[in-house]
């Protein structure tokens, strides 16, 4: 009687390009939560359930919202999905451009601080430098640096700064909480 040995099934190993389970959970909770809040706020505004926000008519505010809102779920997807392939690279380039336009358009949003820059504008140079560092490290093959920088950009530049957007005096806070 012959028998074939059964292969031992080992759990899949994390590749060096993937996030740890704790980091994946943090990104999912923070990014998913803020994306859901943004979707509810936009839905309330679109249905006329939220108060009017005249500042949305300003070009800088409209451009900023138009780039930040798709960057939230796209960044979440990029951090959680398989990395390194052509799909990841293409969507990563789109995300970098969205973030760059969002950061630069934030320079034109100063009506809440009487025409002056506020503390939230410190995210602008940090985001631009972080984007440059992330792209340069990916092109150089420094994937660990690329990964760390992208996580910091998403959690700090998008989630951290995005949390300020839901303050009561800001547009997203007004739309979400009324």
Regions found by a protein language model. Name each.
Residues 2-178:
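Alpha-helical membrane insertion/targeting regions
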């Amino acid at each position: 009687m012959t028998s074939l040995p059964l292969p031992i099934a080992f759990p899949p190993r994390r590749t060096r390009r993937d996030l740890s389970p704790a980091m994946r959970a943090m990104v999912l909770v923070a990014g998913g939560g803020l994306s859901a809040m943004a979707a509810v706020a936009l839905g309330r505004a679109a249905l006329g359930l939220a108060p009017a926000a005249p500042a949305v008519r300003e070009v800088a505010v409209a451009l900023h919202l138009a780039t930040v809102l798709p960057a939230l779920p796209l960044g979440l997807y990029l951090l959680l999905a398989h990395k390194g392939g052509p799909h990841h690279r293409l969507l990563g380039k789109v995300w970098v451009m969205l973030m760059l336009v969002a950061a630069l358009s934030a320079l034109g949003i100063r009506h809440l601080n009487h025409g002056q820059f506020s503390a939230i504008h410190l995210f602008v140079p940090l985001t631009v430098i972080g984007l440059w560092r992330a792209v340069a490290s990916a092109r150089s093959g420094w994937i660990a640096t690329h990964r760390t920088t992208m996580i910091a950009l998403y959690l700090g530049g998008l989630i951290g700064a995005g949390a300020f957007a839901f303050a009561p005096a800001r547009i997203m806070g007004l739309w979400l909480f009324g």
